[in-house]
């Protein structure tokens, strides 16, 4: 790729009107006036090998083991750069816990299952789900459950361990092993940490990916009079301590990811997401279970969605790299195609629809009745509003599921990569929850 970059990538910038519209937020952190360690690293890399793809830029900025954002920042919560749904209200995680138990029951009550979370954050979501498992202990008493967390950040894995594990049981650590940490949850369930989904044991499993896919690196493409051209990141010759976007003057290998009938003028493609979906689909088709994906995204309609967040504010993605989170909306139509017909897919449906179908209003009323403190009641109501309000998270976030075809009594459709037919049996969240 480097040789191709050297031959192909022009030093001519993207038209300024397009750049302003797509990439500049006008919000910069206080550190933006300084050259960050990540910026120095990127400039050295670009000077050595030429401009880099947006996907490579995102990967370096977020996960570089020495200078990456996820390695050195506590990005979650009020003091971080963004707040996720589990940090807002316990109800969110509780309803997801109910979803997994409901699916376990609907698929035959296996004697064992794994709960696998991709990118668990602080561990808050898993903790809320485990609380539901404990509350439904009489239902799950014959089932052996284990927890498996896929986490690349050592710092976050330590936070997750503090949230989830029993302090009296020492953690087993082995940095060289595929399972780099093991322990026992506060409710007595075995828990393990991995760096890659492929390292998680196969078997009947429920997979959870909440705000996981949106941080995977995307390739960006712009339609030009000469065809599709990939967007690269280069050093700005007018400001040597700044970066800018440029277009490749000829085709690059990643162009193969674009659909032949694509009608949008600007496209983002996430090959890493496709790899994860293919792995999930293969596992679910072979050993059963389901995958529940919650993220902000679209169904193949949006164009440029790459953005940065610094202290809960939009932030220019090229300014002070390494100090802000980078994210791009998930293209659920792409995820559906990557399942390649191995499994059935449902959604995406808006978060407010999913949570309403799962009974969030009933759960809120129960908690409000139990909360005698008016301040606690207000906190519950504020959390509900954040999750359900169309202007907040209600319509921005979506739920998407992968399930075995037999769960819906739907055939494989000859391997066609399209959305599954309407299920003959209801699936909670995508339909109204009904306990049997």
Swiss-Prot record:
Coiled coil: none annotated. Residues 1-41 form a transit peptide. InterPro entries: NDUFAF7, NDUFAF7_sf, SAM-dependent_MTases_sf. This is Protein arginine methyltransferase NDUFAF7, mitochondrial. Signal peptide: none annotated. It holds the Pfam family Methyltransf_28. The keyword Ion transport does not apply. It comes from the Eukaryota. Its EC number is 2.1.1.320. It comes from Rattus norvegicus. Arginine methyltransferase involved in the assembly or stability of mitochondrial NADH:ubiquinone oxidoreductase complex (complex I). Acts by mediating symmetric dimethylation of 'Arg-118' of NDUFS2 after it assembles into the complex I, stabilizing the early intermediate complex. One of its GO terms (cellular component) is mitochondrion. It is found in: Mitochondrion. Residues 413-436 are annotated as: Disordered.
